[in-house]
């Protein structure tokens, strides 16, 4: 199916939905696309990365759903993306927390998608500063 689209894109969540290190996972995925599919040479985008956090849940243990874990996971994901030769861009999923339908109750605390770098009231989580610092540190960042 890579023969038809002009761009190859993937939504990946290393360190969130699986424990694979972000750089290892992305390199294996990118190499597979380049070597084994019709996506060779096409622009490659990471169209979703992220991890969930409950606003205000902070713990030095860096457990899932904590702001510390989210900031650390996103930092590792973005570092992997910007370090991957041939990767053309990335989207952080998502800017703000948002409600989801009731059927997600078992995996979504508060019936929310809590992957925002700010909460539903636009209060920044720790990951907000992490994302800002990483993007502002890029040579291509335009202020």
Language-model features, listed with the residues they occupy:
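Substrate-binding clefts and catalytic carboxylate motifs of secreted carbohydrate-active enzymes
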Residues: 1-143
């Amino acid at each position: 199916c890579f023969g038809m689209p002009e761009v190859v894109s993937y939504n990946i969540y290393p360190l969130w939905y699986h424990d694979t290190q972000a750089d290892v996972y992305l390199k294996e995925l990118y190499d597979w696309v380049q070597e084994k599919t019709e996506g060779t040479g096409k622009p490659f985008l990471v169209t979703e990365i992220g991890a969930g956090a409950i606003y205000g849940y902070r713990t030095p243990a860096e457990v899932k759903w904590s702001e510390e874990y989210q900031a650390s996971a996103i930092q590792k994901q973005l570092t992997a993306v910007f370090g991957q030769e041939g990767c053309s861009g990335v989207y952080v999923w998502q800017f703000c927390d948002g409600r989801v339908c009731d059927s997600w109750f078992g995996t979504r605390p508060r019936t929310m998608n809590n992957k925002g770098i700010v909460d539903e009231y636009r209060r920044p989580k720790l990951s907000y500063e992490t994302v800002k610092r990483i993007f502002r540190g890029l040579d291509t960042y335009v202020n």
